[in-house]
Amino acid sequence: MTSTGQDSTTTRQRRSRQNPQSPPQDSSVTSKRNIKKGAVPRSIPNLAEVKKKGKMKKLGQAMEEDLIVGLQGMDLNLEAEALAGTGLVLDEQLNEFHCLWDDSFPEGPERLHAIKEQLIQEGLLDRCVSFQARFAEKEELMLVHSLEYIDLMETTQYMNEGELRVLADTYDSVYLHPNSYSCACLASGSVLRLVDAVLGAEIRNGMAIIRPPGHHAQHSLMDGYCMFNHVAVAARYAQQKHRIRRVLIVDWDVHHGQGTQFTFDQDPSVLYFSIHRYEQGRFWPHLKASNWSTTGFGQGQGYTINVPWNQVGMRDADYIAAFLHVLLPVALEFQPQLVLVAAGFDALQGDPKGEMAATPAGFAQLTHLLMGLAGGKLILSLEGGYNLRALAEGVSASLHTLLGDPCPMLESPGAPCRSAQASVSCALEALEPFWEVLVRSTETVERDNMEEDNVEESEEEGPWEPPVLPILTWPVLQSRTGLVYDQNMMNHCNLWDSHHPEVPQRILRIMCRLEELGLAGRCLTLTPRPATEAELLTCHSAEYVGHLRATEKMKTRELHRESSNFDSIYICPSTFACAQLATGAACRLVEAVLSGEVLNGAAVVRPPGHHAEQDAACGFCFFNSVAVAARHAQTISGHALRILIVDWDVHHGNGTQHMFEDDPSVLYVSLHRYDHGTFFPMGDEGASSQIGRAAGTGFTVNVAWNGPRMGDADYLAAWHRLVLPIAYEFNPELVLVSAGFDAARGDPLGGCQVSPEGYAHLTHLLMGLASGRIILILEGGYNLTSISESMAACTRSLLGDPPPLLTLPRPPLSGALASITETIQVHRRYWRSLRVMKVEDREGPSSSKLVTKKAPQPAKPRLAERMTTREKKVLEAGMGKVTSASFGEESTPGQTNSETAVVALTQDQPSEAATGGATLAQTISEAAIGGAMLGQTTSEEAVGGATPDQTTSEETVGGAILDQTTSEDAVGGATLGQTTSEEAVGGATLAQTTSEAAMEGATLDQTTSEEAPGGTELIQTPLASSTDHQTPPTSPVQGTTPQISPSTLIGSLRTLELGSESQGASESQAPGEENLLGEAAGGQDMADSMLMQGSRGLTDQAIFYAVTPLPWCPHLVAVCPIPAAGLDVTQPCGDCGTIQENWVCLSCYQVYCGRYINGHMLQHHGNSGHPLVLSYIDLSAWCYYCQAYVHHQALLDVKNIAHQNKFGEDMPHPH
């Protein structure tokens, strides 16, 4: 592909350049591009042929109408009215208690006074919906606390100071006042009032500004300034009264909320996430249960998440990294219906307790990230915070965000420090067995490479100085969202092909949908203008602009000839004016955003632009609207504005990439189908290895999908693991989105499955950047219903509506994870935010002990994952090699080798575990071999996890019952039984080795209120026993479990073996001849089929598919008229003479046998480049370049002739 500044001759030559592994192609065929005139002879149709084509056109309309009806039947939930309003509880009665014997006690009434003054000063009280605080009833408090404890606290109302002090001294870090009980009841009741308001649809979200705090309070224990656990009571209250099944509790207080954790650590209906200062247990509350290794017990395993900070001075980038890499992916899989935040602000810079360096703007970002969950049902409950100014500003910033104000830009975001990277990596290691979305969330690197990274980080980071925090301000906007559109852009049309996918109706249908939903009326409509000559010349050559302008006066025949000089282009007399108007509209929107006229905007424009090069039109594009808009923004701002361009069009934006590849002020990120270089625009420009050049090295980021079916889970995984970490580190001042919607489900070109809800979430997550200054500019998208619904969903997000609930039917595909990982590996040297890695110790771990545990009942459909703890085993089939990874006790990377987490694949292993049955590199528990999973179960009631009574003792795989055999566990120095078994699986040797695991002194990291006053004693307690009488009782010691017998595992592998061959075909073959599957009827590569239906919880290897033909193909122009002699479906192969199974080429009408006979048609395609062939067996048409079946009205004529010859009658209907 041409680079910036090359002439059009080079541009035309680029079209014939092929991937070295791709079949040869002649000049008559291009991908997603028109055939060059004269390359393939075409006769002029006579009147009879024209009439017949008209008849076939009517038949073809039925299929298109069915597609539209199907899309219209999607449950897009866009008509639902978005809730508005932020609730606030702030009651003066909560200040009626203080420490009687210590006036300097940090938790005092002045905390709420400072907050109230700040909110009044910023005018926030008037913008909120105020709610009267109420007292929590005893019955409500008893949802979490014991009646005896509540009664004891009630008696404090009548105690004198001496008695209060004596009682307080029996607890850790508390004081008591005669009004403490009533204020604690009022604080809990305040949160419950907001729960009623949010779940009762009175408001969208809310904040309870209360004291005393609550997250340290336990079942029967006062602790850490806390009497009653407000968020814990609120969670149980929501479940009991409002029938909420799944609650997410986020605790960002600098102290670990052990009281909340202990309340729910065996409950899969509550996901608890805490990010706190730990310092290897040296920081209060000094509990091992506060470390990353504690993930819950019993059915609650995996539902407790701790990200411990092991040093002070942690910054915004560290907190954001934990949210992006850990919390958000897990929360999306969990699917909470309500989010509660234990919102302590003692991690803010200047707080005497926390000694951290987070900023109010950082907490605004965290709040914004959480607002995308649970349909926006979010409640913040004040916990700690003891620097009055920092506390007031932190509360104010979070409340601004709840109200819909844009997040302030971070002053010095940078990247997470090495200590934060270690903590996040350890948390991911501990959680990966329990959450499908976290599979391969960290990648293994050798210790030598990690040491090189550490040297680089030391050089890059340098000594850190606390920034001088500015006074945060929020813009006063006339309108929130600008909308630019002009019907005149519909004048650009194809004069020769009315069925070309880039039709004028694209923008009309979008605008009609925006108006139907009332979204257009909520936006500020901006009048577009044509781009000026100077604006166009910032990205395009004067010669090219003049050349395109000259087309306005060309005749039809000249326009047709001119169109053939470019890739996939049609030109009409109005093309130049429309392209100029589309680009000018984008520039007008940039002006409105940068001037503060609007916060963000959407440009509904055509023709698209991201393929347009400096001196050449390409791929339906003439002027690169996004690129010109970016340069215009830098021009009017007067400096090299940092601009992030995100291109989520399914095709790689080659033109945009080339225009900024040497410019570090513009970060270009593209997610697109690449298919090993065979998907348009073809070549290697869209590969992950393309990183920019010169000063722009590292500022070009390509996530190259190597297949179809990419959906919400895949794009969000890329967002969390790659796009957002880099974006926050870059810290853009403006975000431009090349918003093509051809990756949407139902699009005829993309073959992907992104939903409108998915696009809404992608948009929302980007809105935290650049102070909310984001502009969406329409690119591709060729299903009118899909693009209309998708743009409407994005517009709602821009307007501040919470993203709709997003149910992910499956985890990310293995192919998607491979693409994301490939890009991360390329870019981790340029972006420190990507260095969340496992460490490969070349010497191996000092201990090979493997401790397995029994999963009582899976709260998620990954039963097998729950059969190993953080000490994981990597199994390599065919080699008999087992790599055991043992985490040292409460360790993190950076400690001694014996305490280092090591889980790695060998160097020569492929990156994906199950490819053609050749290599198996999965944990025993995962057992996803041959494309299926052991013991998958689903719960109809709990999307993100099973209900508490869900039990499983036998798992059915492929129709076979796999009994979980058990053995006795020796505890207290004894070892688990060692079992070794080798059996042949598909020709490979599978060696199952379970190493010894010493369980000396195993304890649970938990305190109990009755036996450990002060919350410091660590005691051993048994796990809850299983409720299923068929399941053997679990071991009473955490970390021990009966093992799966070798015979059971081998039997399951044999059951699953059948799927490995078909799965391996698509992922292991090169994009050359061997991957041109599907020539024979029914022989299409399943990975290239359109997804029709799937079972929730299944991996990509186990999804069920049906072959669905594409309704349009860019290579249909290569179909030539039928020869006068007609077709003979009995004609033998032109090479070998077989009549067994033959295909006819639709360009030259030669007949050859299929790939499963002698493969002569495949050879013909390789020699001629002719793309489309028709099966004489079932009359299906196959396109080699699209790697898909195609059914379009252009094929109906030849299909009907073949049908007549085969059956003696016309086709009754399209099939």
Swiss-Prot record:
Disulfide bond positions: none
Catalytic machinery residues: H216, H611
Region annotation (Histone deacetylase 2) ranges: 482-800
Binding site for Zn(2+) 3: C1145, C1148, H1164, H1170
Compositional bias segments (type: Polar residues): 1018-1047
Catalytic activity field: N(6)-acetyl-L-lysyl-[protein] + H2O = L-lysyl-[protein] + acetate; N(6)-acetyl-L-lysyl-[alpha-tubulin] + H2O = L-lysyl-[alpha-tubulin] + acetate
Region (Ubiquitin binding): 1154-1156, 1182-1189
Ranges in a coiled coil: none
Pathway connected to this protein: Protein modification; protein ubiquitination
Entry GO CC: aggresome; axon; axon cytoplasm; caveola; cell leading edge; centrosome; ciliary basal body; cytoplasm
Start and end residues, zinc fingers (UBP-type): 1111-1209
Acidic residues composition-biased segments: 449-463
Cofactor(s) annotated in UniProt: Zn(2+)
Principal subcellular localisation of the protein: cytoplasm
The family this protein is said to belong to: Belongs to the histone deacetylase family. HD type 2 subfamily.
Protein name: Protein deacetylase HDAC6
Species: Homo sapiens (Human)
